[in-house]
Amino acid sequence: MKILFLALIAFFITSCAKMNSDYFNSSFAVEETKINYNKIADDFSQFIISYYAPNKTTFFINEDKNNRDFSNYFINTLRKKGYAISNDNSKKDLTFLSYQISQIDNENIVAIFNINESKINVIYKIIENKLVKPNITSFNFTPKTKG
């Protein structure tokens, strides 16, 4: 519990900091290999559907080249929900999206999603080699109005 509290404080502080050049670069840095991380993509795509209308939202994702498996699964999951994905950041009306997935310790994974200038943090517990989502925290999350 102490670790989660410290992690939340750290995320609060970083969410107030100005954007850096890596803000929209996705990264995937975890040590545990026995876990199926696709749950993170599934959870995010289910969460975001309430705030950004499929078929009316085009995401620009600067994907992580080091973990193609997760990146491809994440992009395909969004496409299956009806979202368009663009590789051209000069197009109009893009919604910029990136993710940073990292391991806090042996029991916790954090997934941070940057959507335009908003941030969503999700902390997952590792229980019996599975990810369990006990909590979603969002800092400065201003969703686009659906419709």
Task: Enumerate the language-model features and the residues they cover.
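Sec-dependent signal peptide recognition
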Residues: M1-I9
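C-terminal motif of bacterial Sec signal peptides marking the signal peptidase cleavage site
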Residues: F12-S15
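Bacterial signal peptide processing site
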Residues: A17-N20
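Short, low-complexity, disordered segments immediately C-terminal to signal peptides
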Residues: D22-A29
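Post-signal-peptide N-terminal segment of Sec-exported extracytoplasmic proteins
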Residues: I35-D69
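Short helix-loop-beta junction
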Residues: F74-I85
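Short acidic low-complexity segments
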Residues: Y83-L94
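Amphipathic beta-strand/beta-sheet edge segments enriched in Tyr/Trp
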Residues: T95-G147
